[in-house]
């Protein structure tokens, strides 16, 4: 396992930046270990899988979790507003960093993650391949 850490600055898109980092570093399989910071614009998909909400108010990143691959990332976040009310959902593009966001990722050397369309869900779902002796195809 390899650990990656990087910092985002004001105006950067949280999701796009994580996805670009994964591609740039050729991370075939990984997870988010930690994400802290503040957003001034939030864009989340709700649990119904359809509704997307955009909120133009400051929110602290309370937690983030997700699977990472060069084939796509699946990330959920919990966010707290100025009244300490917490919301959460599926991270979409246009979650914009206010001041900073500190991201720590773990990369696995014994797995390869990819995504394939699943007709039963309507989404590109995670496909997990275990790599024996750290030898990739």
Task: Indicate residue ranges for each PLM-predicted region.
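N-terminal intrinsically disordered, cationic/polar leader segments
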Residues: 1-74, 79-137
């Amino acid at each position: 396992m390899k650990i990656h850490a990087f910092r985002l600055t004001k105006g950067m898109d949280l999701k796009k930046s994580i996805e670009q980092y994964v591609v740039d570093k050729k991370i075939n399989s990984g997870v988010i270990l930690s994400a802290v910071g503040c957003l001034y614009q939030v864009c989340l998909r709700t649990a119904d899988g359809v509704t997307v909400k955009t909120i133009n108010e400051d929110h602290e990143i309370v937690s983030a979790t997700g699977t990472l691959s060069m084939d796509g990332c699946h990330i959920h976040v919990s966010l707290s507003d100025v009244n300490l009310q917490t919301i959460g959902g599926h991270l979409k593009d246009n979650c914009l960093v206010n001041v900073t966001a500190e991201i720590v990722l773990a990369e696995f050397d014994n797995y390869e993650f990819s995504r394939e369309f699943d007709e039963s869900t309507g989404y590109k779902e995670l496909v997990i391949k275990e790599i024996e002796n750290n030898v990739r195809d």
